[in-house]
């Protein structure tokens, strides 16, 4: 029976954060995971002496009733540094501000598990600082930044550690854009309009509150930046390579999401034409992120695929990533749910377990 104890500090109790906490508190393990901090923007639960917070499954009520203000991040680092046991910080937010403190956490020996893409897809200097592997640094795991709980990042890191070399990666990295193109461009002829599919996707909750945040391609660009960097391409930033936006120029600046959706149908013509051209070649349209390690090139945009291609037969909002390496000349294909609270939280919890095993 292991006597290993790790202290877990959690920031964010939203949709993913809630699923993570429920999974963490229900988990059975030979390692003891003590929840010592639970923080939201304004209020928090904090154990000053690092004894486990006695909240159990009632953590929501305990947090809602708390009158303790959330510590500024510098103060939080100073507090966690004094922990007698190793600390894992779990950031379940998408905050760029919190991500900006990751290097400080890590340099103070605090490990990080997170689905937050911001730090890993920002400037290259931050990436290098986070993975400098200084012996006193905390560990950094971010499986859920690409493909939610799918084992994409862990697979890439593992094969590279064993001496394999990534040659090409291409894939459908966005659950939202997967759904939209799977409905819009099919092997069976259809008259579905792009604008109508976007409206349905929003109704079903697949898109961000403002669908332009999906259609601008930046979310895919961030994910491609991450897998590109892992594969050895020094991608400067998500805006340093070609990213095709699906937002018609005149609609980029309209004030509201409702106005955008209302006017989107005025611009269906170009994508309808592209769909028809693809159909005459027995192909479908998909929104793809690509990395070519040999040419150090990265891109995001619409591509055509034969009806027989794995990307063409995709259903729903699945992600699918194809990875070609020196050893895997026939590409490895990883497919499954690339979004959703439960699978994302499981990806984060898996990272917490991996870190704990190394501490």
Curated annotation (Swiss-Prot):
Cofactor: a metal cation
GO molecular function, one term: NADP binding
Cross-link (Glycyl lysine isopeptide (Lys-Gly) (interchain with G-Cter in ubiquitin)): 290
Annotated positions binding L-homoserine: 208, 219
Gene Ontology annotations of biological process type: aspartate family amino acid biosynthetic process; homoserine biosynthetic process; methionine biosynthetic process; threonine biosynthetic process
Note on how the cofactor is bound: A sodium ion is seen in the structure; a metal ion may subtly affect the relative position of the nucleotide-binding region to influence enzyme activity, and could increase the stability of the enzyme.
Residues annotated to bind NADP(+): 16, 93, 117, 205, 208, 340
pH and activity: Optimum pH is 7.5 in the forward direction. Optimum pH is 9.5 in the reverse direction.
Keyword Coiled coil annotated: no
Active site: 223
UniProt-annotated binding residues for NAD(+): 13, 15-16, 41, 93, 340
Highest taxon of the lineage: Eukaryota
Keyword Coiled coil in record: no
Catalytic reaction annotation: L-homoserine + NADP(+) = L-aspartate 4-semialdehyde + NADPH + H(+); L-homoserine + NAD(+) = L-aspartate 4-semialdehyde + NADH + H(+)
Chain ranges passing through the membrane: none
Positions contributing to Na(+) binding: 143, 146, 148, 150
InterPro entries: Asp/hSer_DH_NAD-bd, Bifunc_Aspkin/hSer_DH, HDH_cat, HDH_CS, HDH_short, NAD(P)-bd_dom_sf
Pathway stated in the Swiss-Prot or TrEMBL entry: Amino-acid biosynthesis; L-methionine biosynthesis via de novo pathway; L-homoserine from L-aspartate: step 3/3; Amino-acid biosynthesis; L-threonine biosynthesis; L-threonine from L-aspartate: step 3/5
Subunit architecture: Homodimer.
Family, similarity comment: Belongs to the homoserine dehydrogenase family.
Role: Catalyzes the conversion of L-aspartate-beta-semialdehyde (L-Asa) to L-homoserine (L-Hse), the third step in the biosynthesis of amino acids that derive from aspartate (the aspartate family of amino acids), including methioinine and threonine, the latter of which is a precursor to isoleucine; production of homoserine leads to a branch-point in the pathway as it can either be O-phosphorylated for processing to threonine, or O-acylated for processing to methionine.
Identification of the protein by name: Homoserine dehydrogenase
Naturally occurring in which organism (per UniProt): Saccharomyces cerevisiae (strain ATCC 204508 / S288c)
């Amino acid at each position: 029976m292991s006597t290993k104890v790790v202290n877990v500090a959690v920031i964010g109790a939203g949709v993913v954060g809630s699923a993570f906490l429920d999974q963490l508190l229900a988990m059975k393990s030979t390692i003891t995971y003590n929840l010592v901090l639970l923080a939201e923007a304004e209020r928090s639960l904090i154990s000053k002496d690092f004894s486990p917070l006695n909240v159990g499954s009632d953590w929501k009520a305990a947090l809602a009733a708390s009158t303790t203000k959330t510590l500024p991040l510098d103060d939080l680092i100073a507090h966690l540094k004094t922990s007698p046991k190793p600390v894992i910080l779990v950031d379940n937010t998408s905050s760029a501000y919190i991500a900006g403190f990751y290097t400080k956490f890590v340099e103070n020996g605090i490990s990080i598990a997170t689905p937050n893409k911001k730090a890993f897809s920002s400037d290259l200097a931050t990436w290098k600082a986070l993975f400098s592997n200084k012996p006193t640094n905390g560990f950094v795991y971010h499986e859920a930044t690409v493909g939610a709980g799918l084992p994409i990042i862990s697979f890439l890191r593992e094969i590279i550690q064993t001496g394999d070399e990534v040659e090409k990666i291409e894939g459908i990295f966005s659950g939202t854009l997967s759904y939209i193109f799977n409905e819009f461009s099919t092997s069976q002829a259809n008259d579905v309009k792009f604008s109508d599919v976007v409206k349905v996707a929003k109704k079903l909750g697949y898109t961000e509150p403002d669908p332009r945040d999906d259609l601008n391609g930046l979310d895919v660009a961030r994910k491609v930046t991450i897998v590109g960097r892992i594969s050895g391409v020094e991608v400067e930033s998500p805006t340093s390579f070609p990213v095709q936006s699906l937002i018609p120029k005149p609609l980029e600046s309209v004030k509201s999401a409702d106005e955008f959706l209302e006017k989107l149908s005025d611009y269906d013509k170009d994508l309808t034409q592209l769909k028809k051209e693809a159909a005459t070649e027995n192909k479908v349209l998909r929104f793809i992120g690509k990395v070519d390690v040999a040419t150090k090139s990265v891109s995001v945009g619409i591509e055509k695929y034969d009806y027989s291609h794995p990307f063409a037969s995709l259903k729903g909002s699945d992600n699918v990533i194809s990875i070609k390496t020196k050893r895997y000349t026939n590409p490895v294909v990883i497919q499954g749910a690339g979004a959703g609270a439960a699978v994302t939280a499981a990806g984060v919890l898996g990272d917490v377990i991996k870190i704990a095993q190394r501490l």
